[in-house]
């Protein structure tokens, strides 16, 4: 835990390691608000446990609606400078917390959390075993070894991770684009947002993402659906199925 050592040490540590390797990237394990460690003289990034906490309430425990989830995510983004937000290590799991899959009621909810993680500003962190749905509440459970002998690279969850990572690598807008909320009504569990990026020619590239955490099909606003469907599960005739998602490249 980086906060258990004083700031003077980390400033000296940064100076020492940068003298050896100028482009080294330092990530600190900080569980609380990390602004004081991210002033450019200590760490370049921190493990974003707030990201996990808010995702846990929306996708896992389902105690937050879309409005609250968006409000907390907005507060988290506004807390730091833009370059810091885009460098934060966004995690669902780590070596110190119960497996996120165990906190979700079903695999479908976990899948939506993964889609959100891979399309949110920052650096998505995949802890070993996330891609195969490892579970565990207690320390001896969530730190269990990787089940190499039973690893199924054709499982739906493994393929979801592969496709989400491939899409993020391919689409610069998902890595560098701005973030804008589209749907986040209080009392609703349907969340929609947009990643958009101005290109060199002045045009705007945009990908809209919709996640339905409701237990029933919901209609999406027609004006938000125009464009090329990049990836979808459960989108049909303007209706998004329960626990479905859609990624749409918006028309210019």
What residue spans do the PLM features occupy?
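Active-site-proximal helices and loops of the catalytic beta/alpha 8
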Residues: 1-83, 116, 135-163, 216
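Beta-sheet entry/capping signal
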Residues: 16, 23-25, 87-89, 123-126, ...
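Active-site beta-strand/loop signature of hydrolases that rely on acidic residues for catalysis
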Residues: 29, 129-131, 212, 243
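Aromatic/acidic polysaccharide-binding cleft in carbohydrate-active enzymes
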Residues: 40-45, 86-93, 98-108, 114-153
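Glycan-recognition and catalytic regions of carbohydrate-active enzymes
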Residues: 127-128, 135-138, 142-207
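Surface-exposed beta-strand/loop patches in extracellular or lumenal glycoproteins
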Residues: 213-225
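Solvent-exposed beta-hairpin/edge-strand motifs
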Residues: 223-234
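C-terminal beta-strand-rich structural cap/linker in extracellular carbohydrate-active enzymes
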Residues: 236-252
